[in-house]
Each structure stands twice: as structure tokens, then as C-alpha cells.
Amino acid sequence: MKKIAFFCIPAHGHTNPMLPVAAELVQCGNKVRFYSFEEFREKIEKTGAEFISCDRFLPELNEKQKENLKNISQTEMSIQDIRITLKMNDFLEKEFKEFQPDVVYTDSVCFWGKLNAWKFNVPMVVSTSTFAFNQLSSQYIKNTPAELADMIFGLPKISKELKTLEPYGYHVKNTLSLVQNDNSTDCIVYTSENFQPYSESFSDHYRFVGPSVFSKILPNKKKDRPLVYISMGTVINDRPDFYKNCISALKDMEIDVIISCGNAIDKSSLGELPENIKVYNYVDQLDILSKADAFITHCGMNSVSESLYMATPMVFYPQTGEQYAVARRAKEIGAGEMLTDDSVEGIKKAVKTILDNKNYARSADKCSKDFRSCSGTAGAAEFIENAPNKSNGYDFLKEVNKASGKFNIIYWIVACILIVLFGVFITWKFTWIAGVTAGVFSYPFGRAMQKKMYKSMAAKRSGK
């Protein structure tokens, strides 16, 4: 029997995948202590884990501040997490000494979980609730200008805040070492190797176990007419305008529609509903998806994974950079289409496209079979029990960094040659124009070379 400490932030999308893993570990005879928050108590205690409340360490917020949490920046969130870590210092110090965990299983963005595992030198496994991201897979993320600005200008603020941790025994090299996982960190990712972008670029410290779900039900699409399910998740779901457009778009179609709107809006604000459309605050999403023929989704990792697990094709409506990455990958495998126009006509057209073309359903079904062939919660539990795991010795990212150095040298040589040619044959007067022109024309060449190097290294990584 091992003693395992679970840590997570107060978020459904991060907590939910950890619950079946906790249940599996308890069933295997391990003692699990789950440090979380009161809104998750019931779910956690159902797994058999011991629930430890951490609500008193959260900042006190008025109603307006709670509402603004939906729009909080990554910088503000990181600073808040650092301050929560400091508030929890004395409490967790006593807990670690009393419980003496053999392993820490922590959400990837739960600073107090990571930092205390390092501080007390306890083997750590990281729960990754979305894709595993490195310098290759992060190319899938499409950040807004505001998100990019926040990253650039926020790093110095976070670095300054991190220094407040040092007197308490928390030693962090830099911000990235805290928020990102390298190839020597044991990580569980709740998807398959086939669905994970650039999965070959991750060492065997990463275990791709497939979606973490309790349900054993299978897809059952046999109905009198198609069922369309709509949900915007649990965070950015205050979208009455969007739901109204969905209702107007689908009310006259020969389909049934279920909308899960959360508790952010009053259902009555959506007006009188046609007979074929029902609106609920919450539903059993897996059960609905097992019957649904199409899913309009915000593209949270859990929602997309559950949809694919139940072989349901999607209309993608991502709201954040990470959600766009998930949508982009699901579109690549042919399991749906992007909603580029959220007007009434745009929604109607997108739903008809998914329902009329059975290739989307076939692609989703193929992915479903792939997910169900993964090791699942049993594989995750075994991985945690055996932490720390050993590497196979090949560090793909180390090779990528070497290749990137070569790429940068070649890129700038080509750019300089183009600048000289521009100056000799056209004009030296506007050197900045020459520089931009050179950069634009040499970039495609450089990217093609870079992709070729990555492909070569990926073959080496997989032994081909």
C-alpha cells in the first residue's frame, strides 16, 4: 500500500479527470488523501479518497470579483496561485510530516502541489488535463493578441512574485520551470498517443492513458431522429445570445436538441422553447453524448475527449487558445468542423454539415476505438504507484534544441544574403524594408528545413 497525496486547483475541468484515478488507486488498496475544495467534496469522497478542505486559503471575493474570475488573465491567476501557496505553507508542512506521502499526484497548474513535492523531495506525477505541450505541440495554440501581451508583460510580474517563495524553502529556477513540464517529469495525459500532437516528441516519462471516465456505457445512436447536444462548459458559459441563436437555428429542423447552460444564466431568459428543444442547467454529459449525433462544444479537453469517446462528431466553437488547439487537432482527424459564423444561419449550416456527412461520425468512431484501447485509469494508477519512472535515455527535446540552433544559423545566413542582394540590386536606402523582405522570403525555406529535421528526429525517437 502506498500513501498518495492529490492536489488540484478549484476547477471542474482539472478535478474531474483525477477522480477516476483516485477511485482506481483506492480500489487497489492505496491510501489517497485529496487536497481540494468544498464544491468537489461529494465527488471526491465517492471515490473513497480522504477529502481535505482547502477553501480557507482561497482569497475572499465579493460577487463582482467572482464574476470577473471568468476573465482573469494567466498572469493574475499565476500570481494568485503563488499567494495561495504561501498561505498554505504552514498547513501543508504539517500535512506532509504527518501523512508522509510516497507520491504526490498534482494538477499541472497547481503550484502548491508541485512546489511542496519539490520542497519535501517526494516523487511527483503530474496530471495534465489538456494536451501535453512543448515547443512543438504548442504550435497548435492560437492565442489572442491580449493573451500574447499578457504572456510577454506578465512574466516579469510572476518572476517577482516567485521570489517571495524563497524564504519558505521553495526554490524555483524561473517561471517556465513551474508552469511547464520537461521530458524528465512524470506526467499522465488523458488522451491517446494518436490524438496527442507530436506525441513522439515526449519521453516515456509521459503516459498517454486515454480519457479518464467512470462510465462503461457504449455509444447507442439508434433513435427516431438525430439528437444535437450543446454545451459551453462550466467556465465561459454565460452566453444567452449564443444559446438563443442555437434555438432559432435548430427549432425548425427535424431533430431533438438538448442544451446544458450551467447556472450562469436564467433558463427563462432564453424565451419560450419549441417542442424539440430542452434546456437544463446540468446534465449527465456522457449519457447524452452516448446518444447524440452532433455536439456543439467550446472544445474544453474533457468535453472533446468525452465526445470522441462516445463517437460523437462535433461543431467546434473554441473560446481560448488551448481550446483552439484541441479543436484544431479534432478537426485534423476529421471528427468535426469549426463554427466560423455563430449567427443563426451559420449555426444551422454547421449542424447540417455534420449530420449530413457521415464521414465525421466514422472518424469520431475510429477515435473512440483508439481511446478505448488505451490503458485508462488502471494504467494511470499503475504509473503513479511505480513513480518515479525511468527514461529510455533519448531526449527528443534536447535534440530539437540542437536542431533549432542549426536552423537559426541557416535562417539568418539566408536572410543576410537576401538583404545584401536587395541592397545591391534595388536600394540600401531603406534597410529596414530589406530586412523585412528578407525575413518574409527566407521564413518558408527555414520552416521547411525545420519540419524535415523534426521528422527525422521523430523517426529516431520511435526507432524507425
Residue ranges and their predicted role:
Residues 2, 30, 37-46, 50-227, ...:
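Nucleotide-sugar-dependent glycosyltransferase catalytic domains
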Residues 440-461:
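Membrane-helix interfacial anchor on the cytosolic side
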Residues 15-28, 40:
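Short amphipathic alpha-helix
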Residues 346-413:
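C-terminal amphipathic helix plus adjacent low-complexity
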Residues 225, 261, 265-282:
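Nucleotide-activated donor-binding/catalytic signature segment of Leloir-type glycosyltransferases, i.e.
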Residues 22, 104-106, 282-328:
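A donor-sugar binding/catalytic signature common to diverse glycosyltransferases
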Residues 1-12, 21:
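Nucleotide-activated donor-dependent transferases that construct or modify glycoconjugates
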